[in-house]
């Protein structure tokens, strides 16, 4: 399992105004718990955490937490990230201390490899799951699942049951959950609309021409008000 270093600052349990001030400074209030130890209140740099998780490609990565002003270093995993309900920005983080001898639950990202044969034939990928839930010892967790999809034809699909997990890792997600399907684009499925047929409102005259209210004159021509013209 990949790991990365994250700096943290100890904080006090403050008021709502104090927490709001932390966020204005780009810091996320966080808590570290686990291994029967007292909870530790900290704050971390929001951009640093986001960049680290993105670079490591998994929210289940093991982080080496370095507490500023001390020699304290802790191996932790991100357990929960709370987000603002409106802007969806992170506003609080829970970290769990890693016990190397105790299995943990983790979300492992799925990485698709190759271009499906069905896509080359004109199909498109319809995505399902992006991550798979697993259980295993922290040191054995894979950073991601690489899945070859180049063999998939039109109308084929791939489910969790098609994933092979490494030794010591159990997949918890339901096996019939769909990861992706190769489907025919909607534009191909729907027939093209035929051109509309224009309807003629009047009866045709002797030469095929109609007047404005449908009455024809003697030679097949109609005058403006539909009355028969003088011969």
From Swiss-Prot:
Protein function: This is one of the proteins that binds to the 5S RNA in the ribosome where it forms part of the central protuberance.
UniProt-annotated stretches for the region Disordered: 195-231
InterPro entries named among the record's database cross-references: Rbsml_bL25/Gln-tRNA_synth_N, Ribosomal_bL25/Gln-tRNA_synth, Ribosomal_bL25_b-dom, Ribosomal_bL25_C, Ribosomal_bL25_long, Ribosomal_L25_dom, Ribosomal_uL5_bac-type
NCBIfam families: bL25_bact_ctc (TIGR00731)
Record-given protein name: Large ribosomal subunit protein bL25
Keywords tagged on the record: Ribonucleoprotein, Ribosomal protein, RNA-binding, rRNA-binding
One Pfam short name: Ribosomal_TL5_C
GO MF, one annotated term: structural constituent of ribosome
Subunit comment: Part of the 50S ribosomal subunit; part of the 5S rRNA/L5/L18/L25 subcomplex. Contacts the 5S rRNA. Binds to the 5S rRNA independently of L5 and L18.
Highest taxon in the source lineage: Bacteria
GO CC terms of this entry: cytosolic large ribosomal subunit
Disulphide bond pairs: none
């Amino acid at each position: 399992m990949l790991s990365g270093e994250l700096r943290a600052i100890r904080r006090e349990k403050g008021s709502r105004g104090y927490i709001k001030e932390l966020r204005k400074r780009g810091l996320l209030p966080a808590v570290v718990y686990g291994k029967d130890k007292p909870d530790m209140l900290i704050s971390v740099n929001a951009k640093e955490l986001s960049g680290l998780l993105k670079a490591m490609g998994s929210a289940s990565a093991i982080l080496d937490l370095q507490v500023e002003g001390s020699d304290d270093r802790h191996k932790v995993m991100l357990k929960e990230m709370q987000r603002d309900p409106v802007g969806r920005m992170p506003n609080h983080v829970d970290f769990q201390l890693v016990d190397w001898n105790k299995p943990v639950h983790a979300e492992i990202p799925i990485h698709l490899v190759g271009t499906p044969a069905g896509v080359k034939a004109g199909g498109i990928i319809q995505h399902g799951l992006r991550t798979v839930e697993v259980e295993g010892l922290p040191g054995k967790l894979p950073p991601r699942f690489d899945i070859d999809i180049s063999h998939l034809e039109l109308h084929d699909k791939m489910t969790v049951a098609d994933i092979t997990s490494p030794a010591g890792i159990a997949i918890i997600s339901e096996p019939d959950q769909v990861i992706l399907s190769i489907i025919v684009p909607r534009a191909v499925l729907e027939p093209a609309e035929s051109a509309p047929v224009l309807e003629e409102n009047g009866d045709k005259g002797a030469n095929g021409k109609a007047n404005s209210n449908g009455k024809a004159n003697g030679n097949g021509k109609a005058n403006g008000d539909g009355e028969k013209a003088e011969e």
